[in-house]
């Protein structure tokens, strides 16, 4: 049964000169993959990191037999392959600050959804317009929140709000 996917993309440049966000959607054989990657602005070639990661994950999805036998395993594999491709990109470019990106990925199949993320790109689970759950950032301020050192309303203004502890292309991802 075909999967009908309705999605909207809103991407704001903010105070930067370029937008390093990338969105990719693929569907076929009753499954769909939705990917959002955000190239890290302080790093060289963040947009290329996001493009590379999206391309690798879409190619893997298109080549995989559907329905996917192990959806969570597929997400793990897709993120791992994207990470390896972005690390290889950084090696080829030979720049001091390697290309990096954060990622949110969602797989829909048989009326079920599985998701994963790396960094501070989030997945929100909505029901009737209300947020039921969201992924927790791999960031310093998220850790402070979990420890009870800051409140959620203090996260946005915290001086370390942009410090990501895990990302595609980074060490330890």
PLM features: residue spans?
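PP2C/PPM-type serine/threonine phosphatase catalytic domain
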Residues: 1-173
């Amino acid at each position: 049964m075909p999967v009908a996917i309705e999605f909207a993309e809103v991407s704001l440049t903010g105070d930067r000169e370029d937008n390093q966000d990338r969105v990719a959607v693929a569907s076929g054989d009753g499954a769909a993959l939705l990917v959002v990657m955000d190239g890290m602005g302080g790093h060289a070639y963040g947009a290329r990191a996001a493009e590379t990661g999206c391309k690798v994950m879409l190619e893997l999805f298109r080549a995989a037999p559907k329905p996917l036998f192990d959806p969570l395993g597929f997400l793990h594999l897709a993120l791992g392959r994207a990470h390896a491709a972005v690390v290889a990109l950084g090696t080829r470019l030979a720049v001091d600050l390697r290309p990096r990106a954060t990622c949110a990925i969602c797989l829909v199949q048989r009326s079920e959804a599985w998701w994963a993320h790396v960094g501070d790109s989030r997945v929100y689970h909505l029901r009737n317009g209300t947020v039921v759950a969201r992924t927790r950032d791999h960031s310093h301020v998220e850790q402070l929140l979990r420890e009870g050192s800051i409140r959620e309303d203090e996260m946005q203004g915290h001086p370390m709000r942009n410090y990501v502890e895990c990302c595609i292309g980074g060490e330890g991802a």
